[in-house]
Amino acid sequence: MDATVKKMSPETSRPSREEAENAVRTLLRWAGDDPSREGLLDTPKRVAKAYGELFGGYNVNVEDVLGTTFEEVGGYNDIVLVRDIPFFSHCEHHMLPVIGKAHVAYLPNGRVLGLSKIARVVDLFARRLQTQETMTAQIADSLVQYLQPRGVAVMVDAEHMCMAMRGIQKSGSTTLTTTFTGEFKTDVPQQVRFMTMVQNR
């Protein structure tokens, strides 16, 4: 899977804030409401501001988050797992929320990451229009590229509002995706250890 998000070409460059706000007004009219009524006067401005935050992952480079690693301390070479990382994303098909948790592990190969950076890389990819499958692969691929560990394991468990709020309307159902690389991919007992560590409370 090609998990790379390519930059916009000059022909599809980012519109201005004013254009974004006008687009919100158009959607409000299309939905059947009046963007000039009192309760909606500031809505286009608020939506544009919210989108800047919700999709802030487009403004962050992976290298800025994972570009600095540390030499291993004390010879530790077993699983490093950060579990239950909460995230909010939006599906690229309907632009509706995806709410879930990510569990990310790696096997060190001489270098380690600050633990907060694992959570930050989850947020980086979550704050973009996504499919859950792509996001899972992107997290793993970025750790492989910048940390070069012996293996990476990523599990994402999320509820998709496009299933809960529209269409089939099955609230409470979740989707589970996993990606394994290196020793986690070739060594089944390591996969089992990862799954057990994620599930144990």
Curated annotation (Swiss-Prot):
- What do the Gene Ontology cellular component annotations say? cytoplasm
According to the record, the residues making up region (Disordered) are: 1-20
Catalytic activity, EC: 3.5.4.16
The positions annotated for binding Zn(2+) are C91, H94, C162
Key words of the record: GTP-binding, Hydrolase, Metal-binding, Nucleotide-binding, One-carbon metabolism, Zinc
Domain of life of the native organism? Bacteria
Give the Gene Ontology MF terms in alphabetical order.
GTP binding; GTP cyclohydrolase I activity; zinc ion binding
GO terms for biological process, alphabetical:
one-carbon metabolic process; tetrahydrobiopterin biosynthetic process; tetrahydrofolate biosynthetic process
Matching InterPro entries, A to Z? GTP-CH-I_C/QueF (IPR043133), GTP-CH-I_N (IPR043134), GTP_CycHdrlase_I (IPR001474), GTP_CycHdrlase_I_CS (IPR018234), GTP_CycHdrlase_I_dom (IPR020602)
Catalyzed reactions: GTP + H2O = 7,8-dihydroneopterin 3'-triphosphate + formate + H(+)
Question: In which pathway does this enzyme or protein participate?
Answer: Cofactor biosynthesis; 7,8-dihydroneopterin triphosphate biosynthesis; 7,8-dihydroneopterin triphosphate from GTP: step 1/1
Read off the HAMAP family from this record: FolE
Regarding protein family, the annotation reads: Belongs to the GTP cyclohydrolase I family.
**Could you give the subunit structure recorded for this chain?**
Homomer.
Write down the NCBIfam families for this protein, in alphabetical order. Answer: folE, PRK09347.1-2, PRK09347.1-3
Protein name, entry field = GTP cyclohydrolase 1
Gene that this sequence comes from: folE
